[in-house]
Every structure is written in C-alpha cells, then in structure tokens.
Amino acid sequence: EGSGGSGSSGNFTTGSNVRMSSVTNTSNAGTGTSGGGNSAAASGASVNAPPVTVTLTESLLNK
C-alpha cells in the first residue's frame, strides 16, 4: 500500500519538490500522522490519505 501511494503521489507532486518530500516522509511514517486520531487504523488511514493529498496538491498547482 505504501509503495503504491507514494508512487501515485509522486506523479502529482512532480511540479512541487517540497510537497514531494513531505509526502514521502509521511508515507514512511505509515501515514499515521495524517490520520491523527485515526492512527489506530493505520491501514484505513493510509488508504484514505492519498486522495486527500492529491486534492491538496491539485489546489496548490491551480493557484
């Protein structure tokens, strides 16, 4: 799951190198920090994390 998520996010974050490094660090941590209170369900949080990250990157690129 982590490898797939990082790969997809890497494609979207090609424009911003800073965001790319941030996403990579989050993936290594198990994306538990992204979930916050949902850290208990690491597997569920990791699956829900990529879509949110992609949305944020797209909004930044549009600006």
Swiss-Prot record:
Keyword presence, Transferase: no
Keyword check for Manganese: no
GO biological process, one term: rhythmic process
Subunit structure: Forms a heterodimer with timeless (TIM); the complex then translocates into the nucleus.
Subcellular location: Nucleus; Cytoplasm, Perinuclear region
Main location: nucleus
Ranges annotated as biased composition (Polar residues): 54-63
Region called Disordered, residue ranges: 1-63
Post-translational modification summary for this protein: Phosphorylated with a circadian rhythmicity, probably by the double-time protein (dbt). Phosphorylation could be implicated in the stability of per monomer and in the formation of heterodimer per-tim.
Organism placement in taxonomy: Eukaryota, Metazoa, Ecdysozoa, Arthropoda, Hexapoda
Entry protein name: Period circadian protein
Keywords carried by this UniProt record: Biological rhythms, Cytoplasm, Nucleus, Phosphoprotein, Repeat
GO annotation, cellular component aspect: nucleus; perinuclear region of cytoplasm
Compositional bias of kind Low complexity: 9-31, 39-49
